Amino acid sequence: MSHSKVRWDFWNIISGGLMVLFLIFLVYPIGRLLKESVYTDGKFTMEAFRMFFSKSYYYESIFHSVKIAFCVMAASLLLGIPFAYFYSFFRLGGRKLLFVLCLLCTMSAPFIGAYAWILLMGNSGLITGILKSFGINGVSIYGFGGIVFVQTLKLFPLVVIYMNGAFRDIDNSLLEAAESMGCKGVDRFKRVIMALTMPTILAAALLVFMRSFADFGTPVLIGRGYSTFPVLIYNQYLGENGTNYHFAAAISVIAVLVTAVIFIIQKTASNRFKFTINALHPVCLLYTSPSPRDS
């Protein structure tokens, strides 16, 4: 019998190294997390999961986190898709500067963005003080609405980045063919452009959902008692009332399961729109003014 020899070339070594890193930094931590959630003092128990689902304060955090993530995802798509569309199809004044500013929003830590909005719209914030001088009270950055608002401004640039690439991959001949058949304006956008970019839209939606669901900095600063998964896990590990590692591990396992379900739903939906776009004729930018000069 002849045995094939493994070729230890550069790429095989890289592949093996990546596999080892994957096992160490992903599989092993999740395995330990699962073990900690069902083993207490060396005994198998589901007490941590029972405690989680027995109190509304705990299990409502599932709905709070998912609700925030869905709202942020929807708002980010509503902002990001039109932004990317006009940037990709039109020569707007200052378009490059706007795109750079949009990218800068993704580079700051969540704590920085949340704290900045506290300075603007907190109880003693600049905008809050101006509104109070005009007799407008009750405007606050804290709570559910504030979390959604701050996270949306932080995450919608991810949609812009994804959709800008997708729009530029559309073959201009398809758009010209649609126009020749009478499909123009909003109808062309819905029936042609949106259909061609649907896989990218779903991918961007999943990314925003996951980032929002896992965000800790924004809810802990402006949540004001609105419990979310990351804050709940943090409080169990480093809370003022002591630590409960097993309960925190159980909450983390539930969070992993929720994100896995969302991922499966996204993959199932994206499989319905699986195709490849090759822009043999890139999209021609339209001018919004008589000047053909790009900003």
Predicted feature locations:
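Conserved small/polar residues in nucleotide/adenosyl-binding loops
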Residues: 178, 287-294
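Membrane-interfacial helix termini and adjacent extracytoplasmic/periplasmic loops
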Residues: 2-4, 46-50, 59, 94-97, ...
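Membrane-embedded alpha-helices of multi-pass transport/permease systems
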Residues: 27-35, 78-85, 112-115, 124, ...
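Feature of multi-pass inner-membrane transport and sensor proteins
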Residues: 171, 187, 224-230, 261-289
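Short membrane-interfacial helix/loop motifs at transmembrane-helix boundaries
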Residues: 12, 17-60, 66, 134, ...
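Transmembrane alpha-helices
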Residues: 17, 74, 104, 152-171, ...
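Transmembrane-helix boundary motif in ABC transporter permease subunits
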Residues: 2-6, 71-102, 115, 163, ...
